[in-house]
């Protein structure tokens, strides 16, 4: 299955609550390949915002988002978008110009985290261990494996593991036949066999870590992330105390050096052969669905979903 970016000319606006202490525009859906995930995330968020006593207007974002925001004049924008135009720094940039406080990270940190090769370079520059990777363009016309197998193919700018493929030694795969479905460039990353860990960070503080145990599929792809029964979450992650602490410290380091804001989720692999920790990415707009990791770790840390949303709202600001 392919998930593509779609151009949507007009935003859809729906008033969810007419009274409250402040007016929040909950922006979700949008035009990215992660549209459906964003809409599912927004369902719980809108309930929490209403429970917290806010006046809430829901906006399914289209190209006229600036016009709609100018019309409704919210006090705060809750950025519940995933993927292109929301998670890549576009919406934060617009909100900076409009001087509307918003949740989640700003322009630079969002753009850096969303682009896999730039985030990898950032990790390297800040002495954060990360997997070897290269960029391959469609124009290169490569006919052989661009890296020794096993390796991972990742779209340069997609989230939710959309378009991610792992090419193992035994796979019947010819790179010459790869059709670059998500843009003219991909990241080719060395596959690291090991245990996968996720860390939730809120306002510069790591809340905890969990381990992903695969039940179905060979790697943590889109289907595995969002289908119940495909993966098991072990929370807290069953690790020796010093290694668990290192996970939290490394996550906070990534968050702070990238100048993130609000919630984020850092992803790591503990290599089976060397017991070495590798940072894979940081997600500045983590999911808020029933199967999402940040709310699960927050609950383990004693923060229920409504209080998590309240804490995120407190961080709303724009960059001047």
Curated annotation (Swiss-Prot):
Free-text function comment from the UniProt entry: Cell wall formation.
Protein residues bound to ATP: 147-198
The protein, known as: D-alanine--D-alanine ligase
Organism of this sequence: Rickettsia akari (strain Hartford)
Substrates-to-products reaction catalysed: 2 D-alanine + ATP = D-alanyl-D-alanine + ADP + phosphate + H(+)
Keyword line: ATP-binding, Cell shape, Cell wall biogenesis/degradation, Cytoplasm, Ligase, Magnesium, Manganese, Metal-binding, Nucleotide-binding, Peptidoglycan synthesis
Residues annotated as domain ATP-grasp: 120-314
Amino acids binding Mg(2+) 1: 267, 281
């Amino acid at each position: 299955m392919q998930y593509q970016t779609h151009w949507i000319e007009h935003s859809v606006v729906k008033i969810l609550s007419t009274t409250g202490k402040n007016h929040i525009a909950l922006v979700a859906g949008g035009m990215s390949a992660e549209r459906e995930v964003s809409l599912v995330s927004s369902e719980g968020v809108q309930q929490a915002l209403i429970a917290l006593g806010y006046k809430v207007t829901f906006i399914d974002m289209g190209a006229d988002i600036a016009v709609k925001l100018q019309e409704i004049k919210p006090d705060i924008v809750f950025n519940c978008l995933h993927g292109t135009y929301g998670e890549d720094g576009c919406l934060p940039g617009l909100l900076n110009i409009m001087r509307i406080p918003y949740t989640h990270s700003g322009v630079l940190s969002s753009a850096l985290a969303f682009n896999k090769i730039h985030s990898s370079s950032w990790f390297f520059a800040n002495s954060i261990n990360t997997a070897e990777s290269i960029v391959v363009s469609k124009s290169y016309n490569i006919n052989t494996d661009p890296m020794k197998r096993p390796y991972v193919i990742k779209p340069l700018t997609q989230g939710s593991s959309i378009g991610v493929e792992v090419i193992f030694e035994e796979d019947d795969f010819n790179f010459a036949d790869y059709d670059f479905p998500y843009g003219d460039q991909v990241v080719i990353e060395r596959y690291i066999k090991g245990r996968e860990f996720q860390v939730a960070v809120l306002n510069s503080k790591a809340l905890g870590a969990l381990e992903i145990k695969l039940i179905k599929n060979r790697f943590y792809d889109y289907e595995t992330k969002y289908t119940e029964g495909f993966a098991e979450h072990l929370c807290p992650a069953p690790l020796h105390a010093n290694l668990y602490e290192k996970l939290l410290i490394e996550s906070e380091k990534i968050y702070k050096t990238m100048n993130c804001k609000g919630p984020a989720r850092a992803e790591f692999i503990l290599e089976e052969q060397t017991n070495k920790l590798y940072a894979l990415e940081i997600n500045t707009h983590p999911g808020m669905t029933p199967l999402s990791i940040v709310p699960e770790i927050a609950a383990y840390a004693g923060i229920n979903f409504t209080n998590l949303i309240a804490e995120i709202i407190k961080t709303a600001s724009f960059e001047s």
